[in-house]
Amino acid sequence: GFIISIIMSIFTLVFGEIYMGMIGGAVLDMDILLKLFGVIVLSAFASSAIASFIISFLKTNSAYSAASMIVGTLIGFLVGAYIPIGNLPENVQWLVKYFPCAHSAVLYRQLLMKGSIKENFANQPTAVLKETKEILGVVFVYNGHTASAWMSVVALLITGVVFYLLAVLV
């Protein structure tokens, strides 16, 4: 799952960049692309570790199919794919901020939205930019402190190591 996830993500990124270039849209700098590659590998590591752990409990194809459907839908909500994180109730926002896959989404958003946020909020007060980033899940704020990208990287590394160890031990 780890290798396939990386291949599919890189494939999507490359073709997305080709498409954006063909229609005259903004194309990402090489610096951002290299960082995205790192996030892809890190995300695949953490996600495949969690999947390995969950799969270690499933014994039939039907159990796997049911778990995949439920987990896949739940993950969409918990990473802010369906509804912006800031529009969720406070207790759900708290849960999202401690969900490992949401840290992947934060890192992707920070890299992919960096240029457009800077450009679109250039004439806005800092408070508006800060609030927008929180609502859209570009940053996570814990007790009034904005988490750095490195906190998300560490969260994903720890998640990957812990869940791979648990999958092996189960």
Q: What is each PLM-predicted segment?
A:
Residues F2-I75, L165:
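Alpha-helical transmembrane segments and their short interhelical loops
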Residues K114-V170:
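Alpha-helical transmembrane segments of multi-pass membrane transporters/translocases
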Residues G16-I23, P89-W94, K114-N123:
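Short alpha-helical linear motifs
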Residues L58-S116:
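Transmembrane helix segments
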Residues I32, N61-S62, V92, H145-S152:
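Membrane-interface helix-boundary signature
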Residues V14-Y19, V79-Y82, R109, V162-L169:
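Residue-level signal for alpha-helical transmembrane segments in multi-pass membrane proteins
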Residues I10, Y82-I83, V106, N123, ...:
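Short alpha-helix boundary/capping motifs
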